[in-house]
Amino acid sequence: MEVGGGWWRLLLAVSTACIATTSTTCTTSKTSPNLPQPPGRYDPAHDLGQLFHDVQLSGIFADSKTFVDARPLVAPADIAACYAAGRTAAGFSLQAFVAQRFELPRPVGEGFHTDTSQTMEAHIRALWPILTRRPDTVDARSSLIPLPNPYVVPGGRFREVYYWDSYFTMLGLIASGRTDLVKSMLDNFAHLIGTVGHIPNGNRTYYLSRSQPPFFAAMVGRFAQATDTAQALPYLDALEAEHAFWMNGADSLAPGRGQAYRRVVRLREGGPILNRYWDDRSDPRPESYRPDYEVGQTLGAERREGFYRNVRATAESGWDFSSRWMRDPKDLRTLETTDLLPVDLNSLLYHAERTIAALRAFRGRAGDADVARQFAQAAEDRRRALLAAAYDPASGFFYDVRWRTGQRLTDRPTLAAASPLYFGLATPEQGRAVAARLEREFLKPGGFVTTLIASGQQWDAPNGWPPLEWLTIEGVRRYGRAHLADAARDRWLGLNRRTYRATGKMTEKYDVVDLQRRAGGGEYPTQDGFGWTNGVALALAAQKAEGPHPVSRVRSSAAGARFVVTP
């Protein structure tokens, strides 16, 4: 969101020695699948130096993301030099300086007018072209990392692809018959793994230091389910490369208890490896610079690096922010994300390991059987370790774990507990116990609530989020609670439809407790669009129309290396 009444459209005079420049029009066109990466990627925080810091703290933009998505009209180094030379001159205007030298981004879907006489489903299908970006061209002055194939973005301020969002968007694309677009997005993710070594948070340079919940294997499985298993084989190398990214450093961990490096953790002496969220940087996020910086300034210098690292790791989790990650649920400064073993992350990696094992076995080349056995064993080791560490028999629920002590966070139950059900690694008894508590405490008039704590953060009560609704609904269905799954589905779809009829919008999150209140919390206004909301709504609506999902019962978690798809 930009402020200032459209001031950026005016070329204002600035008392500086620099020469004014004019904007050029950006276009997109179809490009080769072997799209090269720019030789020097534009990194706003690094390349603009003091100008970046000053703009982000100035309040020129209400949203820190606006400036990092803006395109410099001349070389960033020249802009930085101009600023250094002219910023102390009499009458200097920072706002005017930025207006002359940057092309500012516009929200996705701006100008789209909703026809509320359409059904919600028809509205969503009409939005797919609005939310779809054509293949990118290489632009060394953009923070956008170009992708070679079309892709769907969430909408609003989110003008780029987002990793875990895309799985839930794909559910709706498949329900719309758009497996071609799903394939394009899978090809883009494989391209990112091949060029930058992992799937970043989003295709922006400022997201490169972290990823997001690793749903790539689930995407491949869903695509294969919608087409055929052979369609998954081209992604096997990328799946293994992504797994290596998440397991980087595992071989170098000492055998003792409580060892960690980047995203890998050895919980107990001689025990298997589990994973945590991480970020390779420990400074304020460029896209949320002002709020990060201002909170950091309330801490002593010795605590800031750890705070920023935890902020970034929380962004990698996708749950930014939530009482789930804070020692004090009311104090963001107490984030401890890097000290936690998340139950959902390890469920995802279990599924990825089983998927790789299954695809290796399916392909059947020389050596594949041995590799399949290795990954199947890794998955089983992870399953056993996670069930032992994260499941609390007394309360019948899964919790995140403080890896330094092995303590389960039993005072912080969240919808992350549904992930072991969705991915089929919980025992039948555990699945029944978790489902019972979800029904008893988390099911609200509009669906499942994210946590039981109202902290003011957006990933807390009273909010419900489309990805968590899907995982929870289908997780309890997988463990025999079809009636509960159907009830939650109908409540969520009812809330989606009610909001759509009242506002003409599909939003990124909803208040599931007070159905008349717009969801709140977070660092930015609730966004319209919205990719994962659309995807989950279409998939659930299609499921309701067509009857139960074909995979509705527990499959043995010790199953062999057959192809694995998500439920």
Please annotate each region the language model reported.
Residues 18-26:
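N-terminal Sec signal peptide cleavage junction
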Residues 171-175, 218-225, 351-362, 422, ...:
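Short glycine/serine- and small hydrophobic-enriched flexible loop segments
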Residues 178-189, 230-247, 352, 365-386, ...:
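Extended, well-ordered alpha-helical scaffold segments
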Residues 335-363, 375, 458-483:
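Long, repeat-rich segments with strong aromatic
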Residues 193-235, 527:
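Aromatic/His-enriched, Gly/Pro-containing loop or helix-boundary segments
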Residues 47, 51-160, 184-190, 196-199, ...:
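Extended glycan-interaction surfaces of carbohydrate-active proteins
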Residues 162-192, 416-428, 469-482:
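Alpha-helical support elements that line or immediately flank enzyme active sites
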Residues 1-11:
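Bacterial N-terminal signal peptides that target proteins for export
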